[in-house]
């Protein structure tokens, strides 16, 4: 996991945000590179276009799971995504919600204090969910 965290920091220094980092990690796992996809994931940055909406770790995690869901029945995939969302909702309850605004609680320094650990936890949860289904 230390290598993953190091890679997350490297991507963050390049200007990537949560959803982009998670999708790049998915691509890395397959030895792929797709700058167009990473650019598209930028639409999810900071709660969709920096609006403070749904956290990019949540939306990026959902995209990460869907990326690796090839071969799953749609209902099985949706069940996995719901399980992930339920976990994320519980994980972020201490902040009062799952939006970027709630997680940051109006303090921009919370981005440094909270987001890296949250993205790392999301990555671990996604790996766990995929592993449970024989996909990782």
Question: Model-flagged regions — what are they?
Answer:
Residues 24-28, 63-70, 124, 128:
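Short glycine/serine- and small hydrophobic-enriched flexible loop segments
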Residues 8, 22, 26, 40-45, ...:
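Short alpha-helical scaffolding segments that buttress acidic/His motifs in well-ordered protein cores
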Residues 25-43, 93-99:
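Acidic-glycine-rich active-site phosphate/pyrophosphate-binding loop
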Residues 29-40, 65-82:
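Phosphate-handling active-site elements
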Residues 80-136:
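C-terminal binding/interaction regions
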Residues 44-64:
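Glycine/serine-rich anion-binding loops at beta->alpha junctions
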Residues 1-12:
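Polybasic, low-complexity association/targeting segments
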Residues 21, 58-67, 116-117:
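Mg2+-dependent prenyl diphosphate-binding active-site environment of isoprenoid biosynthetic enzymes
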